[in-house]
């Protein structure tokens, strides 16, 4: 045995070939009996019939692998093609000829050695690993063994290499692989049917063929899934069928897929060709009723008969009301798939009346009074039906159609009133959306035939339409004829021409017809629906109220409306008067305070009162910059006093200034006369106000002069008449503030003050007043020249007083100032901030400048103010 095994186990690379010297040893009876018993026992383990070697001489047993899982097999081979005539034993023993030493023996040659050699070969069963190659070259002498057979497993034609007795028949295999696979399948079928074990071991491509060809004892029980075509060796096959044929599926998944497939095929075969048109309204025939019921999720759960009755084709739907019989009768017998909830879909119901031919067809009017009443034959459980001119349509389907229509421009939705006109081109189904609004019948109520009514345009409808009982409770009543339709891009119906102009179905908004069911955004349905079209909703946008008090005066064409012009511009001609003048133009009440320089005291008092109110305004911040600016302007003594005063009183002073500025804001002349002018560049009269404030702080008279100085801001003359140096400084400030003032831009002495003056917010309002008071600037310039002188001395005190004068006229402007600067110490107005600071600085500088000659060049100052203001514009 050892020698035999030694020789019988050729190297791995030689296993596929017949060994050069096969083992030739005679097997004694004991070994033969042992082999037979062992083989039978193994076969019994795997459910095979017992093999009698003597009886099975004619059967070629080859390489029966005992263990289906392992590669160690007991090769039971018989030299079938060459039965040993010498010794019956040999023939009996021959099955045990250990040709398995080369497991890949050609099927036919149990012992491909010489026939006589079978006995000499030492026929001894040997356990060898059987890993046969796909093809085993048969021995040359075994010509008979080269029998071409069709492998019982892989169904390929090949040389017979293995054969297996299946009791009544013998299976031939082309290779040991096929033999093992077949044996394993047989074993699993008989012994492990409850396991889904090794189905993967079967060549998937052969499953369909295996069933008929694998003639195992229980082969009849081997089932192929009718859906996935796989052999599942389990007991869980699901039977399905109506009795004529039983389909078997390996799993519920396959069964469901099969049912879906059957249902799909049946519906495809039975659905009218127009079914697709419902999804695509552009189809011309859609109006003709070709829009058959869509298969919606509800359709799957509703018996086909019910579904059919529920949603006949739109055209037939119209007829359905007349004679629901056709649609109901068309219910098809259930499909073969008993489990399919939907049976074959009946052929489309005959279209009694193509709506395209006559959209107003009376049959529709014959329909029940309202869609509220379900069409005859529609089961109560069916989804709500929408009565359209094409007939009752399930709401889900109708919604889909509406969505498709919404996709189209609303114009082609089909004008309602023209749709009513059979001859109306709009009713022509060329544009699916156009035509009698499908919603018309839907709204139909006890009122006159809804078909005609929906056709009417909203304005054509009597005003009672909104409350028509025909409107289903879920539908919105049509809006009043004149009321703009919600979310409609079109004007109210009343605005629409009554002529044949096609009105988008949306115009049928509230009409019982609900045209294409109301503008899509307003479509009312019993269940939530995604609205495809955005509805424009007016959103109130708060508008800055900076200019609310006196937008006309506050806003100057120069764009200084955001820059409050200091009232100083106005005071330029007449410090009190100027402020009152702009203010008078805005409010006559302030006029007395501004009437004359003598009123400046009153104005200052009023301004002080207002100052407290406007301290929270831009004026406060503006004043603060003013004091630093004043120091920069080179008026340290006068300006420093005012600065401190301005800083402390600035709030009040600034408030007054703001009031003055707001008063003068309309006459906003962003002139670069002085440092005040610089301020004015950004803030117009506000800058002047600042200057006036500084001057006012110096002295009441100076304060008046300061307005004149402010006027100088307005008018370059004031600056010129004023101290040239200061005037130049003011010009610089103006340049800095406005950046557009070429005249004062050339004067760079005070550009730094512009950055200092971030109080443009206050001066925005001032500039507004200034623009109004610009004309007063010239007259005020002289007064402000005087006040400017005093302002240099008493910028804070005089300025505050002067500012009250300004504030009184600027009370209206004061409102601007409050809006502009909520806090006295904070400059809120963004634009005027830099300008106002500059304005304050110019005010400080302007005080001497204006005091020097604010009155000198009043007309020139005014002209210059106007010119600079135009430049700023």
Curated annotation (Swiss-Prot):
Basic and acidic residues compositional bias, start-end: 1-14, 783-793
Similarity remark: Belongs to the SOBP family.
Example of a GO MF term: zinc ion binding
GO biological process: animal organ development; cochlea development; cognition; inner ear morphogenesis; locomotory behavior; sensory perception of sound
Keywords from the UniProt entry: Metal-binding, Repeat, Zinc, Zinc-finger
Gene: SOBP
Name of the molecule in the record: Sine oculis-binding protein homolog
GO cellular component: nucleus
Compositionally biased residues, Pro residues: 460-485
Lineage: Eukaryota, Metazoa, Chordata, Craniata, Vertebrata
């Amino acid at each position: 045995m050892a020698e035999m095994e030694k020789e019988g186990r050729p190297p791995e690379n030689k296993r596929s070939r017949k060994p050069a010297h096969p083992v030739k040893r005679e097997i004694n009876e004991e070994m033969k009996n042992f082999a037979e018993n062992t083989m039978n026992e193994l076969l019994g383990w795997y459910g095979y019939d017992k093999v009698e070697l003597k009886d099975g001489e004619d059967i070629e047993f080859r390489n029966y692998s005992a263990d289906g899982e392992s590669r160690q097999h007991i090769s039971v081979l018989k030299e079938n093609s060459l039965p040993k005539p010498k010794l019956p034993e040999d023939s009996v023993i021959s099955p045990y000829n250990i040709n398995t030493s080369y497991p890949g023996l050609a099927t036919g040659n149990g012992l491909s050695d010489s026939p006589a050699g079978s006995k000499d070969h030492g026929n001894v069963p040997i356990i060898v690993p059987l890993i046969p190659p796909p093809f085993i070259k048969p021995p040359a002498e075994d010509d008979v063994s080269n029998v071409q057979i069709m492998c019982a497993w892989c169904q390929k034609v090949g040389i017979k290499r293995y054969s297996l007795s299946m009791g009544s028949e013998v299976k031939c295999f082309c290779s040991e692989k096929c033999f093992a696979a077949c044996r394993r399948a047989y074993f699993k079928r008989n012994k492990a049917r409850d396991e889904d074990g090794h189905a993967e071991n079967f060549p998937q491509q052969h499953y369909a063929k295996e069933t008929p060809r694998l003639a195992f004892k229980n082969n009849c029980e081997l089932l192929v899934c009718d859906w996935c075509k796989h052999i599942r060796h389990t007991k869980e096959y699901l039977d399905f069928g109506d009795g004529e044929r039983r389909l078997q599926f390996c799993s519920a998944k396959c069964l469901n897929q099969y049912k879906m497939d059957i249902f799909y095929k049946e519906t495809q075969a039975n659905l009218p060709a127009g079914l697709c048109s419902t999804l695509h309204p552009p189809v011309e025939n859609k109006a003709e009723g070709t829009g058959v019921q869509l298969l919606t999720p509800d359709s799957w759960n509703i018996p086909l008969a019910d579904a059919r009755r529920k949603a006949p084709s739109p055209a037939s739907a119209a007829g359905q009301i007349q004679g629901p019989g056709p649609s109901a009768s068309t219910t098809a017998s259930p499909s073969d798939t008993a489990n399919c909830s939907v049976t074959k879909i009946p052929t489309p119901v005959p279209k009694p009346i193509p709506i395209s031919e006559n959209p107003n067809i009376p049959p529709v009017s014959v329909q029940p009074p309202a869609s509220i009443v379900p069409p005859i034959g529609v089961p109560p459980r069916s989804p709500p039906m929408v009565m359209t001119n094409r007939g009752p349509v399930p709401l889900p389907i109708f919604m889909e159609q509406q969505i498709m229509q919404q996709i189209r421009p609303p114009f082609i939705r089909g004008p309602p009133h023209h749709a009513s006109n059979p001859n109306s081109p709009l009713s022509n189904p060329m544009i699916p959306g156009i035509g009698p609004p499908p919603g018309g019948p839907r709204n139909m109520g006890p009122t006159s035939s809804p078909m005609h009514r929906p056709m009417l345009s909203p304005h054509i409808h009597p005003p009672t339409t909104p409350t028509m009982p025909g409107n289903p409770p879920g539908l919105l009543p049509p809006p009043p004829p004149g009321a703009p339709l919600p979310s409609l891009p079109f004007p109210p119906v009343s605005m629409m021409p009554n002529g044949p102009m096609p009105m988008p179905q949306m115009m049928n908004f509230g009409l019982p017809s609900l045209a294409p069911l109301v503008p899509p955004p307003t479509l009312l349905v019993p269940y939530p629906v995604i609205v495809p079209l955005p509805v424009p909703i007016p959103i109130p946008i708060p508008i800055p109220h900076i200019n609310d008090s006196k937008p006309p005066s506050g806003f100057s064409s120069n764009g200084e409306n955001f820059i409050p012009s200091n009232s100083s511009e106005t005071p330029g001609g007449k410090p009190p008067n100027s402020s009152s003048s702009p203010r008078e133009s805005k409010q006559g009440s302030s006029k007395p305070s501004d009437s004359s320089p003598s009123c400046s005291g009153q104005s200052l008092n009023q301004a002080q009162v207002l100052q407290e109110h406007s301290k929270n305004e831009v004026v406060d911040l503006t004043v603060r910059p003013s004091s630093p600016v004043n120091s920069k302007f080179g008026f340290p003594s006068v300006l420093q006093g005012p600065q401190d005063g301005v800083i402390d009183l600035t709030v009040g002073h600034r408030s007054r200034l703001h009031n003055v500025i707001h008063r003068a804001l309309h006459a906003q002349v962003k002139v670069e006369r002085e440092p005040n002018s610089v301020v004015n560049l950004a803030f117009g009269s506000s800058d002047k106000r600042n200057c006036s404030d500084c001057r006012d702080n110096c002295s009441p008279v100076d304060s008046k002069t300061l307005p004149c100085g402010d006027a100088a801001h307005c008018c370059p003359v004031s600056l010129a008449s004023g101290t040239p140096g200061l005037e130049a400084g003011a010009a610089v400030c103006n340049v800095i503030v406005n950046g557009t003032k070429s005249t004062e831009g050339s004067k760079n002495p005070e550009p730094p003050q512009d950055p200092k003056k971030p109080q443009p917010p206050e001066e925005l309002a001032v500039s507004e007043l200034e623009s109004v008071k610009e004309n007063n600037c010239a007259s005020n310039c002289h007064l402000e020249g005087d006040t400017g002188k005093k302002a240099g001395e008493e910028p804070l005190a005089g300025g505050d007083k002067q500012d009250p004068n300004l504030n009184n006229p600027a009370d209206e402007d004061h409102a601007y100032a409050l809006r502009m600067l909520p806090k006295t110490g904070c400059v809120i107005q963004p634009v005027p901030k830099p300008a106002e600071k500059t304005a304050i600085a110019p005010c400080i500088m302007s005080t001497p400048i204006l005091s020097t000659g604010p009155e000198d060049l009043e007309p020139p100052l005014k002209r210059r103010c106007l010119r600079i203001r135009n430049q700023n514009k």
